[in-house]
Amino acid sequence: YKRQEYGLRQEGQIIINNLCAYIRSPFDLAFRYDELSQDKPSPHGSYRENHQEFSVHRAELLAEAKVRQRALQEIHRRLRHFPQGDRRSYVEGSWSGFEYDFSNSVFFYPVDMKDSWYQNSVDFSGCTYYASAEFSGSTYERSVYFCDSTYYDWVFFNNSTYFGEAQWSGSTYHDSARFSWSVYYGEVSFHDSVYGGSVFFDQSLYYDAASFYSSIYRGETGFDGSLYRGSVFVSDSV
């Protein structure tokens, strides 16, 4: 029975790996998201003299975005379960026990991973988000990596619990970022980051070391009401 269970688990991990590999795979038009997400070509953009190519490329981008977003949705809905249909509380889902590697993905569509429960390690390092990203209300039992990423739209990590190491270091936020009402049991790093919009870390609890050093804050910033049980590093920040 255990061997059968192990075999099923291996099969499940292969399915997850394939879905993640597809989401990670390069798509050339993704880097033209700013232009192609508009209804018509920009007068100063690369399609200003070729409206037909704009229409073709826009349709391609939207179609690919739809497929990738659907793949992410299929993962997301299996990362939590609502007992008795109660949307206010959730438990782990049927796919919560697998490892997830989304590293270096380019998300040219909104990312909605809120209320997810991960029992294994998760890697979102080196990612680029052209649209909004929602990770609020999530539980991470092991390590999670969001480091070296770029967010062009808003991103929310509110009301989450991290039992292992959590990394956001080396990231750039062009819009607002939220990390409020969260609990960190392991080491957490936000150092060497740039916050172009407002950012809030308030009402959070840190049990281990927290690193915020060498960062730049260009918008409104909040650390109110947080409790730090471990060391805090905040030097060389402006």
Functional labels for PLM-detected ranges:
Residues 3-238:
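N-terminal leader/targeting and pre-domain segments
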